[in-house]
Amino acid sequence: MAGDLTPSLFLKYGFGGALSCSITHSLVVPLDVVKTLLQTNPGKYTGMMNGFSTVIKEQGPSGLLQGLGPTAVGYALQGFLKFGFYEVFKKTYADAVGEKADQFRIPIWLAASATAEVIADIALCPNEAVRIRLVAEPTFAKSPVEAFGKIFKQEGVLGFYKGLPPILLKQVPYTMAKFAVFEFTAENVYKGLAASGKPKESLTDGQKLSVSLGSGIVAGIVAAIVSQPADTILSKINQEKTDGGVVKAIGNIMRRLGVRGLFLGLPTRCFMVGTLTAGQFFIYDGIKQMLGLTPAKK
């Protein structure tokens, strides 16, 4: 596990997380726009390519960048808190377990990532609400700032957080799978390389980043499948009236869509999240190398 985590180290880990999440999420905004539209208006869009062509035809190329601002800002903040606190809680829980920390490393990864994600999602939620509203309803506001103002005026502070339960339902399992599968995959790749006469210590930084990239792809695909139903609910609930409460609204959405409907846009999301997660760990571990920080894996 990482050494003692000082405030300075936390800021460095957070900085790496902020850049990795903001850059990768911003790069896949066009894919996310189409995915969101497939979920919120499935009768209009028949697939990913049809979604792209329809958006360009109706809104121009800029339509594929709807919600870019909230995405960049929201995921920078979320990445800072998620990666920073993941390192904090990973060490905290390992210290609490003591000598058997290595034996219980998978539960430690799961618990640390879940705790960090809850903190990060509270910060992400308002930006995600604005992003989804701008994508699903292009005429709702001319800018993210205007959208923030309209949501606050119409629904109050709670309007930004009606998507928090599904965000938690989506992001917590997603992040648990993302970190645990990444750590486990990378660990076993390094073990395999060591068995073939190439211990981790002998690898170049570029080779280590290749391991991060490959492990990130595996982690991203698994995490996308695990969190897909809640992602669909999240896209729907920001269009839903929640007068009867968020839980009731979630129940209505689930009954209306059914099991198959909850997996709308899964191929698109697997491609997007696999690419995104691989990019995140590649950038994050690259920044850690540049800053001389302890790698995420032992």
Curated annotation (Swiss-Prot):
Membrane side Mitochondrial matrix: residue ranges: 35-60, 127-162, 230-262
Gene3D superfamilies: Mitochondrial carrier domain
Domain of life: Eukaryota
Record's protein name: Mitochondrial substrate carrier family protein N
Gene responsible for this protein: mcfN
Cell compartments where the protein resides: Mitochondrion inner membrane
Keywords: Membrane, Mitochondrion, Mitochondrion inner membrane, Repeat, Transmembrane, Transmembrane helix, Transport
Membrane topology term: Multi-pass membrane protein
PANTHER family assigned: MITOCHONDRIAL PHOSPHATE CARRIER PROTEIN, SOLUTE CARRIER FAMILY 25 (MITOCHONDRIAL CARRIER PHOSPHATE CARRIER), MEMBER 3, LIKE-RELATED-RELATED
Family recorded in the similarity comment: Belongs to the mitochondrial carrier (TC 2.A.29) family.
TM spans (from-to): 14-34, 61-81, 106-126, 163-179, 209-229, 263-283
GO biological process: mitochondrial phosphate ion transmembrane transport; phosphate ion transmembrane transport; phosphate ion transport
GO molecular function terms noted in the UniProt entry: phosphate transmembrane transporter activity
